[in-house]
């Protein structure tokens, strides 16, 4: 009896030992951890993350770090055009001084007052100064803030509008779907760049302040940019709305808006994240193109495209490459970084991917 009992217990003990060994050597990974592991296995994804980390550190943490290391931004650094304070005095026919002597004719000599424009590279100006005596290195930092912030805000607004319109179109179908998709088709037929150029000219004619101009550009880019996301969301929801969990939601009486935004939209978040990441590079290119053509962010505000547009003169481009080459390099780094990260996320979130 004892031998038979030991024989019956042996397979169970062996199974427990195998299970313990599996638990020691193999860990169960959640879907998020699997995506993260796949993402960081890609060398291009790592390169993209490093590029974006350096870029964001330069743009957003650069000025505070410069101040912390003793780089002061004051009168000796701004080198702005000098001004003359206004002085007034009452004059009569014969103006005399305190001793009663008449003043003679005051001679004004027109002279050029120089500013520190096109200064060479130095400790106070790492990349020199531009035509107006502004430090190029500092303007690159603040220009990065403008370009990156504009890109993120536009992408977020495009995604929100695309989710709402695409979700309604895909879930309800019928006439609602037809109307929304025809609007999407019309927007897709309109070329983006000419519309932005026309809009910028109209904004110029309205004499809008420079500080408010960027918000108008964001609005215009958002209006003409949400159609692609809406089409993608619609296609995914058309597939998901026939699944069992949505049928169960209908049987349980869950409201329509909750089915769309609580149960359907979370299932397409991977595709949305990839779309947002890949879209950032295109938006930065659009903003840089408009600024290069003189229709983007105007002076005195800095943007990478604006800095390049200030050096369109062939003589300036040849003689002062520091005015436009660094800005062009940063634009290339930003676009490549977002594209590398977007490609890595797309491959990592694809269960059929071999990576």
Report each predicted region and the residues it spans.
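Alpha-helical transmembrane segments of integral membrane proteins
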Residues: 129-355
């Amino acid at each position: 009896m004892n031998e038979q009992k030991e024989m019956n217990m042996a397979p169970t003990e062996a199974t427990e030992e195998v299970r313990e060994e599996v638990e020691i050597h193999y860990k169960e990974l959640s879907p998020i951890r699997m995506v993260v592991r796949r993402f960081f296995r890609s060398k291009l994804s790592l390169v993209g993350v490093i590029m974006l980390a350096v870029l964001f550190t330069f743009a957003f943490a650069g000025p505070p770090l410069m101040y912390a290391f003793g780089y002061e931004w004051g009168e000796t650094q701004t080198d702005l055009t000098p001004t003359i304070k206004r002085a007034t005095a009452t004059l009569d026919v014969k103006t005399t001084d305190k001793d009663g002597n008449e003043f003679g004719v005051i001679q004004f000599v027109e002279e050029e007052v120089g500013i520190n424009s096109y200064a060479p590279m130095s400790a106070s100006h790492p990349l020199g100064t531009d035509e107006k005596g502004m430090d190029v290195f500092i303007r690159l930092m603040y220009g990065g803030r403008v370009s990156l912030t504009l890109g993120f805000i536009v992408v977020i607004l495009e995604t929100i509008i695309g989710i709402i319109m695409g979700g309604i179109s895909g879930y309800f179908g019928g006439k609602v779907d037809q109307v929304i998709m025809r609007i999407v088709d019309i927007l897709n037929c309109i070329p983006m760049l000419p519309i932005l150029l026309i809009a910028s000219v109209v904004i110029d004619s309205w004499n809008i302040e420079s500080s408010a101009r960027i918000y108008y550009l964001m609005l215009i880019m958002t209006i003409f940019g949400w159609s692609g996301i809406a089409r993608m969301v619609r296609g995914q929801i058309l597939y998901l709305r026939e699944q069992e969990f949505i049928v169960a939601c209908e049987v349980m009486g869950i409201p329509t808006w909750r089915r769309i935004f609580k149960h359907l939209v979370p299932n397409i978040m991977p595709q949305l994240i990839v779309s947002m990441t890949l879209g950032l590079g295109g938006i930065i290119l659009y903003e840089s193109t408009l600024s290069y053509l003189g229709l983007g962010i105007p002076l005195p505000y800095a943007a990478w495209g604006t800095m390049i547009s200030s050096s369109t003169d062939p003589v300036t481009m040849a003689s002062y490459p520091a005015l436009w080459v660094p800005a062009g390099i940063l634009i290339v780094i930003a676009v490549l970084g977002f594209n590398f990260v977007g490609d890595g996320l797309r491959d990592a979130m694809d269960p059929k991917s071999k990576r």
